[in-house]
Every structure is written in structure tokens, then in C-alpha cells.
């Protein structure tokens, strides 16, 4: 999990670290080449400077969604670092790499995110992010993305932290929230919340998939019930980190 990379306190006087979230639709026969491009290209090239670091590289778990889909999250130090990174991709040393990457995928959807006030991940200690491709156990994540009602966005963010996130602090919880995000201004849909949740107890996931949620867990006073006053649309991705993903 590389918990040492996390800094709880956001920077004063600015947004601090930005997070570039990308969903790649990879060409099936080039899947291994695509992964190698990130492991041997993007990750070490970013590590040559202080502006950005690759954090997560994860596949859609087999049978859980579109085939050959990869999710990556890259941390960018701040707005100025984002500008420098964009220029490297557009006309600098990353231009050739990006052109080669585009030949390995059909398309990519990207958005720039900032952490919610209560997100466990606020800043990132770049010096502590692994960049050498060291291998480790695979991990499963449930990435939930919600779209609160127009007049309930701010309230949803607060209550999601006060109620839902705190409910996962129990030792028996299936999930632990590693990061919670909303889109940066002007970069994507405004009313969106994304949670990166590590599946601590996979056996509970199987039980969740094969059983109906009991009525007592959907009764008034529960998050499943009360949160419907704030949103009723969301989607979940089941992700499996690569063996070398810096965070897992």
C-alpha cells in the first residue's frame, strides 16, 4: 500500500497536489506493450523530475467490465507543474512517448481531480513513491463514482465523510478508503465524487455479489437509505492493481 507516500495535511495557500485520472481503452493484442510503456517509460521519465509521479496502474478485474481497460492515476505537484507536464507531452521529451502510447490504445478519457477535505490522501511525498517497478502482491480496489443532485453536492461531500467514510473504520469492514476526489474546476463534470477503496476482505465481496442487501441495511437511518436524498446515480469499477503499481 506504500502508506508512507501520503501526507494528510493539504498545502496552505493553494490547491496543492492534483491527480490526473485516466481510463484507457487498450488494444487487446498490445496489452503487454501498453503496460510496459507505463512501467518502463512514463513512471521513470516522471521520476527524473519533481513535478509528477505515477501512483496507481490497475486493470479492470476480469469479468467485471469492459475488456482491456486500464485505470491510471498520476499525481502532479501543483498547477505550475501541470503546465510543465503538459508542455513536455505536447512539444517536449514526452511527445514521442505519447505518440507511441496512442498506437497501443483505442481511446482515453481523462479528468483532473483534487482531494476532498476529508480524503486520507491529500498531498504526496514524491520522494517516497516507488519508481523502480518493484513487484508486490496484487490488490483489489472498488472505485465508486457518484453524481449528487445539483443542490446536494456540498452536503453529499460532508455527509459522505461524516457517515460513510467513518462506517468503514471498523476492523471488520470490507473496504478502506485510500483516496476521495472531486473534479478540479473546469476539467470535468462539476458534481462528481470518486472514491478509491481498497478491498481488504475479498471474501465479503463474493457475499455481496451473490446476495441481496438485507432490508435492515436499507432502512431509514442507514447510509443506503438516507444517501438517496443526496444522490441515486453511481457506478462501481472493480480494479486489480498490477504487480508493480507504486500504490496497491
Where are these regions (language model features)?
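An amphipathic, aromatic/His-enriched active-site/gating alpha helix that lines ligand/cofactor pockets
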Residues: 1-14, 32-33, 37-56, 62-67, ...
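Surface-exposed interaction/gating patches
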Residues: 14-33, 117-203, 243-248
Amino acid at each position: 500500500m506504500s502508506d508512507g507516500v501520503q501526507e494528510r495535511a493539504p498545502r496552505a495557500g493553494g490547491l496543492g497536489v492534483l491527480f490526473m485520472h485516466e481510463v484507457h481503452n487498450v488494444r487487446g493484442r498490445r496489452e503487454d506493450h501498453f503496460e510496459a510503456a507505463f512501467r518502463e517509460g512514463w513512471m521513470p521519465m516522471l521520476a527524473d523530475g519533481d513535478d509528477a509521479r505515477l501512483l496507481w496502474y490497475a486493470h479492470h478485474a476480469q469479468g467485471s467490465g469492459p475488456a482491456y481497460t486500464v485505470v491510471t492515476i498520476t499525481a502532479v505537484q501543483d498547477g505550475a507543474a501541470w503546465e510543465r507536464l503538459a508542455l513536455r507531452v505536447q512539444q517536449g521529451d514526452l511527445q514521442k512517448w505519447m505518440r507511441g502510447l496512442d498506437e497501443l490504445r483505442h481511446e482515453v478519457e481523462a479528468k483532473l481531480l483534487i482531494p476532498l477535505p476529508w480524503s486520507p490522501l491529500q498531498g504526496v511525498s514524491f520522494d517516497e513513491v516507488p519508481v523502480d517497478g518493484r513487484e508486490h502482491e496484487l490488490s483489489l480496489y472498488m472505485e465508486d463514482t457518484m453524481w449528487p443532485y445539483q443542490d446536494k453536492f456540498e452536503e453529499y461531500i460532508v455527509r459522505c465523510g461524516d457517515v460513510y467514510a467513518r462506517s468503514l473504520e471498523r476492523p471488520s469492514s470490507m473496504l478502506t478508503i485510500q483516496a476521495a476526489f472531486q473534479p478540479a474546476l473546469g476539467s470535468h463534470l462539476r458534481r462528481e465524487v470518486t472514491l478509491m477503496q481498497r478491498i481488504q476482505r475479498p471474501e465479503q465481496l463474493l457475499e455481496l455479489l451473490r446476495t441481496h442487501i438485507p432490508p435492515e441495511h436499507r432502512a431509514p437511518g442507514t447510509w443506503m437509505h438516507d444517501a438517496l436524498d443526496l444522490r441515486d446515480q453511481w457506478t462501481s469499477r472493480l480494479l486489480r492493481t498490477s504487480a508493480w503499481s507504486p500504490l496497491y
